[in-house]
A protein has these predicted regions:
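Rossmann-fold dinucleotide-binding core
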Residues: 137-199, 205-208
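A short, basic/flexible loop-to-alpha-helix module at the beginning of a structural domain
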Residues: 39-58, 93-96
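Conserved N-terminal Rossmann-fold NAD(P)-binding element of oxidoreductases
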Residues: 61-64
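An accessory alpha-helical subdomain
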Residues: 198-331
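Helix-enriched interaction subdomains in cytosolic or periplasmic regions
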Residues: 6-42, 142, 299-302, 309-320, ...
């Protein structure tokens, strides 16, 4: 069984909440404790190993396995009983030998070098599965299909390498060629606890423009603005509400990471730039409402967006309330 099964977890929580209520104990308290226990349990699974779904697989080669995401996949595959080899920058002279008997090759390199790296690969065994982990999918998928005539799969792990566990994490996948050959690998990822989401490469990149490029750019711009205004962070934190503190943490988190990664994500497509420009235009239109002092127009726009969100607005308010309580509990 996968370490995370949504239905199993939901059933257990519902059952324990019911028992707690019958005993006069707060169901929320019991759920909080159980979720903490489950989170620790998911993390500890990483030290125990996982079932091997394809025991006869030849060695897995991770190109760029020295990077953070490459090391994570090396760890998970090794814990699952597979033999893993690493192909790094200084190994290209031996690349043909390293991949000669590979059962799977995973390309885990920076976005701006992904297509070039795929093109540099020596010929792979006909049945070798070629996989990439880039956060853009259309161009890498086409490059893999052109470079290799065997099975091809595009993956995008929607989490950072510091996540600790794959339980409940989302892995997006784009079919390339011969899906029956890599179905076991998708199932192996599910055994690790991840949730799979299938989508076309084009749709993936369209959605990532909002989820990653626009969001990261807006966060970058806000951080840049704070720095240029030279605000006192200590004072902001002392005065902040739980929601602003959480927002500020998300901004600060961005600047604790690799700037090359975010430059690659934001600048990976001209479509990203076009979307950011439209956002900039709408920002300007909203500023126009302030300049005109037109509160009614502001309220009308607010209601329009509220209607667009529909039931999700209340759902997100409920979800965020839980997050804010947790953030406030962690406040020093």
């Amino acid at each position: 069984l996968p370490i995370y099964v949504p239905e199993r977890e939901a059933s257990m929580l519902a059952s324990r909440r019911k028992e707690a209520q019958a005993l006069g104990v707060s169901p929320d308290l019991i759920e909080d404790v159980l979720r903490r226990v489950m989170r620790e349990s998911y993390s500890s699974e990483n030290d125990k190993g996982f079932k091997t779904l394809q025991p006869n697989l030849r060695p897995v080669v991770i190109v760029g396995g020295g990077g953070q995401m490459g090391r994570l996949f090396e760890k998970m595959l090794t814990l699952s009983g597979y033999q893993v080899r690493i192909l790094e920058k200084n190994d290209w002279a031996r690349a043909a030998d390293i991949v000669a008997d590979a059962g799977m090759v995973i390309v885990s390199v920076p976005i701006h070098t992904t297509v070039e790296t795929i093109g540099r690969l020596p010929p792979l065994p006909a049945d070798c599965i070629l996989v990439d982990l880039a956060s853009v999918k259309a161009e890498p998928l086409q490059a893999m299909l052109a470079a290799h005539q065997g099975p091809v799969l595009g993956l995008h792990p929607m989490f950072g390498p510091d996540s600790g566990s794959l339980a409940k994490q989302v892995v997006v996948y784009c079919d390339g060629r011969q899906p029956e050959a890599y179905q076991w690998f998708l199932e192996q990822i599910q055994v690790w606890g991840a949730r799979l989401h299938r989508i076309s490469a084009v749709e993936h990149d369209q959605n990532m423009a909002f989820i990653q490029a626009l969001r990261h750019f807006a966060t970058f711009a806000y951080g840049l603005h704070l720095a240029e205004e030279n605000v006192r962070l200590e004072q902001l934190l002392a005065l902040s509400s739980p929601i602003y503190r959480l927002e500020l943490a998300m901004v600060g988190r961005l600047f604790a990471q690799d700037p090359q990664l975010y430059a690659d994500i934001i600048m990976s497509s001209e479509n990203n730039l076009a979307l950011i420009k439209r956002y900039y235009q709408r920002f300007g239109e909203a500023i126009g409402l302030l300049e005109q002092g037109d509160k009614q127009a502001f309220i009308d726009s607010f209601r329009k967006v509220e209607h667009w969100f529909g039931d999700y607005a209340q759902r997100f308010q409920s979800e965020s309330r839980t997050l804010l309580r947790q953030a406030n509990d962690n406040r020093q």
